[in-house]
Amino acid sequence: MKYIGAHVSASGGVSNAPLNAKSIGADAFALFVKNQRQWSAKPLTKSEISSFKTNLKNANISLEHILPHNSYLINLGHPDPQQRKKSIDAFLDEIYRCDLLDLKMINFHPGSHLKEIDENICLSNISSSINYILENSSGIKLVIENTAGQGSNMGFKFEHLGYLVKNSCDKNRIGVCIDTCHLFCSGYDIRSKSAYEKTMDDFGKIVGFEFLSGMHLNDSKCDLASRKDRHESLGKGCIGWSGFENIMNDKRIDEIPLILETIDNSIWADEIIALRNLIKGN
């Protein structure tokens, strides 16, 4: 079964996120558990935690289908060890917040070399940071998101993701999230059936479907291999509906959260319906 939702607002408190997901007909969602553009935030109150759990139950959404996203400030590959430690500490704080909400996973961008160090050194930094976080936390799965390769961001090749997964110290707590816009803009085509199968077969061989823990479903304003991260509404970009039809009919992608981050939240409910209608037999 496919579980579809969107990255919904937690404005006014994280307890609002399940209600916002329910309002668009979602059975999965993503959220920020703190302000994504600030290093620190007020602690979650007992009242807010309780309200989140109550609203989640009322929305009838499983914890397994929630994919929180951590701060955009975090850079686990930072060339400066002190800045890297700042990112690690911020990551651990976000895990603590997720634990309070009983969340099972946290999604993150791997990191950036900032054009100051070699890509391989940056990957090694990211890997070491991931392992430190795994060793100093418990339970929650760390879900690495692929990137478009914009600027100096790592994670735009399956080989990057495969390296980080292979070198993680706890394979039960590591996963991968594929963002379709990032995938397409980093050079992996999914538009035709044959292109999709080639791309996903490569993913299976290099990373492994057993590590696929979620997807971000976004069309792209920019063309194949553009290395630019510009999301578009489904069917209105360079990927088109055919790519999403391929995803919705791939049984290897069942039972994980499929999250919209498309640019017009006023049509998220329509996009969710459209995605479900792409499933053959529906």
UniProtKB/Swiss-Prot annotation:
Organism classification: Bacteria, Pseudomonadati, Campylobacterota, Epsilonproteobacteria, Campylobacterales
Alphabetically ordered keywords of this record: DNA damage, DNA repair, Endonuclease, Hydrolase, Metal-binding, Nuclease, Zinc
InterPro entries on file: AP_endonuc_2, AP_endonuc_F2_Zn_BS, Xyl_isomerase-like_sf, Xyl_isomerase-like_TIM-brl
Similarity annotation: Belongs to the AP endonuclease 2 family.
Binding residue positions for Zn(2+) 3: H182, D229, H231
Catalytic activity: Endonucleolytic cleavage to 5'-phosphooligonucleotide end-products
Gene Ontology BP terms: base-excision repair
Function: Endonuclease IV plays a role in DNA repair. It cleaves phosphodiester bonds at apurinic or apyrimidinic (AP) sites, generating a 3'-hydroxyl group and a 5'-terminal sugar phosphate.
Binding site for Zn(2+) 2: E145, D179, H216, E261
Protein name as catalogued: Probable endonuclease 4
Cofactor binding, per record: Binds 3 Zn(2+) ions.
Residue numbers binding Zn(2+) 1: H69, H109, E145
GO molecular function: deoxyribonuclease IV (phage-T4-induced) activity; DNA binding; DNA-(apurinic or apyrimidinic site) endonuclease activity; phosphoric diester hydrolase activity; zinc ion binding
Keyword tRNA processing: no
HAMAP family hit by this protein: Nfo
EC main group: hydrolase
